[in-house]
Amino acid sequence: MIINYLDKVPKIDPEAKIFKTADVIGDAVIGKGSSVWFGAVVRSDVNTIRIGEDTNIQDNATIHVTTALYPTTIGNGVTVGHNAVIHGSTIGDNVLIGMGAVVLDGCRIGKNSIIAANSVLLGGTEITEGVLVAGNPVKIKREVTAEEIEGLKKSAENYARYARNYLTYSKDSIYSQTDISMIIENLTSC
């Protein structure tokens, strides 16, 4: 569902893809070519969420914020894996947040980094550019290779293609551009 909250209406680029079982709430901006998948929640009810271009928020991921302290900003070409949680943090471009990873308030993740599946970033953790981290709490394991950086880009490209395929072959599961425009117009006029 696409939901307004306290007169804040999501801003969704016409080329973004939102699945009908996902929730996008309040002061959220979803960039060009990005996708929010089945069961994912982008809940910007008490602060802002900004999602860049060509980013995918996979099934059952949760993106949230902290009142007045920590908005969430997610860069371009980011892959947020299934069941991941990002709360009040800043994620650079071309990052992988692995399945089930938890990123808590005030974290900053540099571009071209990989957060391993089920890792936990405690509040205020800063991850430099181009590293792989894992664990609870996370520790830097090594630098990311050039091949892995290309793989991060490929992951974002793949999810953009998958979303387009759903729009073509499973139209009932995903909002069309017309659907999104009508919903936003109705929310704005309420």
What does each model-found stretch correspond to?
Residues M1-K11, D45, E53, D59-T62, ...:
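Glycine-rich hexapeptide-repeat left-handed beta-helix
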Residues T79:
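Short proline/glycine- and basic residue-enriched helix-capping loop/turn segments at helix->loop/beta transitions
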Residues D7, I12-T67:
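A positional/architectural concept
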